[in-house]
């Protein structure tokens, strides 16, 4: 356990970083606050943060509308995923008032909700004076909302995305020209990559370096899992032959067919490399893959998509929800709810899908609309259907490992273990044995009994 003075120093450093990253949208947009009649929340300022992805970055462009409507000023930032989670977890643990709205990260839902660090949202949803009937909470996909509930069913987050791992071949033309279709299995994928890698200057394979998100899909495809039987039995199972085989496969795909420094690619870098046609094939999130069909993409007419390839034991596409929540220490929760309501209104999300091709939305009425379905068809492939089919597969329950309260500790150990394997620092069996031992120790410190 860290000593108190170390914890304070770390917290101060993170909050200093947070201050440096916060950009009041009125300054960024160059627009002055609205003039004229008094707004409902004039004089209120909200501090809001979310990890960097398509939707939260788009929100920044629309914030002037929110201030015009409500009078609320917003300090808003979107750091990278690891930085955001570290900062949010630390701030929430103090029950402080530094943030008024935060993203409820999927892997932290059990920890943050179970610890009482977030505000229940049911009273806001049920109050007709705060939430009009046409906002329609029931319109959100139930599977996206479920991780945001506690054991009693109370809601602590409103989902803005369901992350779904799919397969994208930005240069499917190279696969087709060499007699290959979209690979259905990992074996088929590797056979194809052996032929097409480096053709027309394109590297064969890439995936983002959040190994705690990417690796479990490969792990389960080989018949392994992170825990023995989550959520009831949390004994880690990272040192199995299946775990080693999955890690060796992922490392080989990156090292044999990836670009230079493949192990360092973030999700944004993967997306841009695909859009530029520098990568032939990737297992990547649907929300990012949807951008292959948007303005600026060089591969709209050469792209193809499918569910992720299956391994010896099947196909297990990663599915995860993220949503807006209100920290228990937020000073003006009514204003916080106004932001959540506005940012997830049907009108705003619909405009984002129509203008920017926003994918992986969470409102049923939009997913089922003709406009959205058409927008999600890229080069003749219905990526929206792949999204829905992947979510349906997750109803088998294989994502349970990800919402137990101690998964963040396992996530950290997986990330370190895969980093050692892919870099060649350690063999898979050796690295995963170390991850197993470290995860058991971390879970014991967190109070898990074996």
Pin down the residues of each PLM region.
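Short, solvent-exposed loop/beta-turn-alpha elements that line the ligand-binding surface or hinge
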Residues: 39-43, 122-140, 224-247, 294-298, ...
């Amino acid at each position: 356990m860290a000593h108190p003075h170390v914890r304070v120093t770390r917290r101060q450093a993170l909050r200093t970083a947070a201050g440096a990253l916060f950009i009041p949208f009125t300054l960024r947009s160059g627009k002055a606050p609205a003039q004229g009649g008094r707004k409902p929340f004039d004089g209120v300022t909200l501090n809001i943060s979310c990890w960097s992805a398509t939707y939260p970055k788009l929100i920044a462009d629309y914030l002037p509308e929110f201030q015009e409507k409500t009078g609320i000023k917003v300090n808003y930032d979107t750091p990278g995923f690891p930085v955001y989670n570290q900062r949010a977890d630390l701030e929430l643990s103090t029950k402080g008032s530094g943030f008024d709205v935060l993203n409820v990260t999927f892997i932290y839902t059990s920890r943050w909700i179970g610890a009482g660090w977030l505000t229940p949202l049911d009273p806001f949803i049920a109050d007709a004076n705060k939430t009009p009937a046409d906002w329609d909470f029931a319109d959100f996909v139930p599977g996206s909302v479920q991780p945001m509930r506690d054991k009693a069913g109370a809601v602590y987050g409103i989902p803005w995305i369901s992350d779904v791992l799919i397969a994208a071949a930005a240069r499917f033309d190279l696969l087709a020209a060499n007699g290959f279709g979209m690979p259905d299995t990992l074996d088929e994928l590797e056979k194809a990559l052996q032929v097409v890698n480096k053709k027309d200057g394109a590297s064969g394979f890439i995936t983002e370096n959040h190994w705690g998100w990417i690796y479990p899909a490969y792990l389960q495809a080989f018949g392994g899992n992170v825990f023995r039987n989550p959520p009831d039995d949390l004994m880690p199972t990272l040192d199995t032959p299946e775990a080693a085989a999955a890690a060796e496969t992922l490392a080989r795909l990156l090292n044999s067919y990836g670009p230079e420094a493949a192990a360092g690619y973030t999700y944004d870098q993967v997306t841009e490399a695909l859009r530029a046609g520098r990568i032939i094939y990737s297992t990547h999130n649907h929300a990012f893959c949807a951008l292959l069909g948007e303005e600026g993409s060089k591969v709209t007419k050469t792209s193809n998509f499918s569910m992720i390839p299956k391994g010896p034991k099947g196909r297990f596409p990663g599915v995860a929800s993220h949503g807006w929540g209100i920290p228990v220490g937020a000073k003006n929760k009514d204003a916080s709810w106004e932001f959540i309501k506005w940012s997830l209104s049907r009108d705003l999300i619909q405009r984002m899908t129509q203008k920017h091709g926003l994918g992986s939305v969470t409102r049923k009425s939009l997913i089922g609309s003709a406009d959205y379905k058409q927008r999600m068809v890229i080069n003749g492939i219905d990526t929206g259907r792949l999204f829905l089919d992947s979510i349906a597969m997750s109803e088998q329950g294989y994502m349970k490992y990800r919402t137990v309260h101690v998964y963040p500790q396992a996530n950290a150990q997986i990330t370190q273990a895969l980093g050692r394997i892919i870099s060649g620092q350690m063999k898979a069996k050796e690295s995963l044995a170390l991850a197993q031992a470290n995860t058991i120790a971390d879970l014991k410190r967190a109070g898990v009994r074996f």
